[in-house]
Amino acid sequence: EKGCPYRNPIDGESWKLGDATVTVVYDGFQGTTYNECSIVLRVTCGGKSLLLTGDLPSTMEKQLLAKGYNFKADVLKVGHHGAGSSSCTAFIKAVQPQYAIISSSRASTARLPRASVLKRLALQFVKVYRTTDKDVVFNFIDGKISTPNKESIKYTCIKNGTIALSSKVFRSKGKAITPSVSLVVNGKVVSPSEYKIKYSSNKNPGVAKVKLTGLDKKFVGTCTTTFMILPKKETIKTKTVKLNKIKLGWEGQKNVTGYYLKYSTSKSFKKNVKYKIFNNEKNLNTTIKGLSFNKKYYFSVRAFKSNIGDGKWSKTISLKTEKLPIPTKGFFTEIIEKTKSIKLQWKKQSSKYDAGYMIQYSPDKKFKDDVETVTIKKVSKNSFKLKKKPKTKDYYIRVKGYNKYCNGKWSKVKKVKFAD
């Protein structure tokens, strides 16, 4: 109306309109283009608020956000009739609206609002209402918002959907595991043609991921879930027995924490069970020492993954340790008696495990008093010269072999004396 007085408002200015309060959030003075100069108003009533953004473009939205402007509101009147150049994702996140109103004429439905804007709103779970369908009415009463209008749903975000898998726990099998998928959004099953599936970390033991991405036809956004892959059943591959030592090797797996080995003289592992833990996936063999000789043992191994679980025990194998390598009984082969010495010679031990010999001599036939013991630590040396001591003429002697596992039996006792 001509002659009507007017003035430009400034940031922070507010005035009352009945029960509502109108506040200037942005006065438009910082803009350099017509749209950037759009005034942004917040209307507050009944404890709820509506943000009116005019034709404010994303360029100015971002500038104002960077300067700390507060655009928080319950309802957003989408900028520039839903043009793609307005209502950027960062701006929508800053407003945090529950509802959005898009004002555009019925004649422009083919052009506005843009699909990109509708997708951005859907990704933030904002309910959209459009004036192209019907005049939009919102009631702000006592801190509650109501509307007789129906939501205009073109895109639905699947982020908060529920993914059902054929199973949540699998065992590794050396190849990718791809459980079947079902997606439910807002209580309805979504057709598999509406999203694509991507599996990751789904081969080796650990936590595998499933990511569904809407194909932007009706559904947008992503929805994720996980499932567990336990280690596979282990296999003992190599085994070696040497005396009372047993060396085992197993197949091994990738991406496990390590392995458990159990062994026992009980086939059922109900008693006398011992365990070894290997906290390295590359530790694929071990040697168990100090076992009983000539004894059967049972072995099984399994992999484990910390915070995930254990694999199945391998097939039990049995191995028997070798017999105790007892040196043969000592036997003198030659005794040469001289005045000041006596040369002793005995049969050599033949076992590769034998370490040497022990000779004892004493004037006491029962070897209880004045016993002297000589240890020879070379199995190849099978002789010894016994030297005469003052006032000692006769000796009783005996010899035996020994190794690191045990001693042989003493030879028959021989009586020797120094020649006159």
Give the location of each predicted region.
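Serine/threonine-rich, repeat-prone extracellular segments and beta-strand-based repeat modules
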Residues: V189-V220
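Pro/Thr/Ser/Gly-rich low-complexity, intrinsically disordered linker/stalk tracts
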Residues: P231-N255, F293, D310-S351, K409-D420
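Hydrophobic core positions of the immunoglobulin-like beta-sandwich fold
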Residues: T238, I288-K289, I376, L386-K387
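Short S/T/G- and acidic-enriched coil/turn segments that sit immediately N-terminal to beta-strands
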Residues: K282-T286, S380-F384
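Beta-strand-rich modules
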Residues: G290-I308, K389-N407
